[in-house]
């Protein structure tokens, strides 16, 4: 009986293993196609078009906004991925409340980051850029959360496509702008930031539509005890992400 049980488990696991390997190969293939073209093609072309000063201006603001990025998630995405993969039925129960919790965290992140910008003496132009970059950070974090639901439901192919969708849209928008404004100094760095915003908004809308269809959300309600419970369960993941961030930055 023990041998039969082992054989049965092995037989049942094979399709899942095959599915995982196939989708892992798809993720790698898509990223190998898209990411190098983005980094070596579009991103490099934007740097050359706007010049070192403007790109450095953007990059400094981007790095500043990244300092408190942990506030946007607090380990929720990693916890949710594990939780939904083990309990698919919890998606419809938890999704709406987690979205509201993330909106609350996004508001805290935005306020703290903007206050930090004012404290260190950002001028109005820098604050405008910071607001756009903050929005992009919020959208990226939300996309990652939505993707954790897709992965938890084992929709690996959909997750793979979503993982490169924002880059594809950015490539299309930036390519058009770079062709139209190819003369040195004619391209503005804010267009690059807005192109990212547009790409993230479109990707968020598409992914949200897919996840809501799976979650069958009826209404969004504030559940403070639930918020506290989720944060308690997700904080170990937040600590891990924070430690990894320190490790990569130092």
Region roles according to the model:
Residues 9-21, 185-193, 205-249:
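Interhelical loop/hinge segments that connect adjacent transmembrane helices in multipass membrane
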Residues 17-18, 46-54, 68-101, 151-157:
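Transmembrane-helix boundary and interhelical linker motifs in polytopic inner-membrane proteins
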Residues 19-77, 136, 171, 235-250:
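Signature of the first transmembrane helix
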Residues 33, 37, 72, 96-123, ...:
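Alpha-helical transmembrane segments of multi-pass membrane transport and lipid-handling proteins
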Residues 63-66, 102, 106, 137, ...:
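Residue-level recognition of pore/gate-forming positions within transmembrane alpha-helices
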Residues 67, 103, 107, 111, ...:
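Alpha-helical transmembrane segments of multi-pass membrane proteins
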Residues 83, 139-162:
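Membrane-interface junctions at transmembrane-helix termini in multi-pass inner-membrane proteins
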Residues 127, 131-134, 160-213:
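Hydrophobic alpha-helical transmembrane segments
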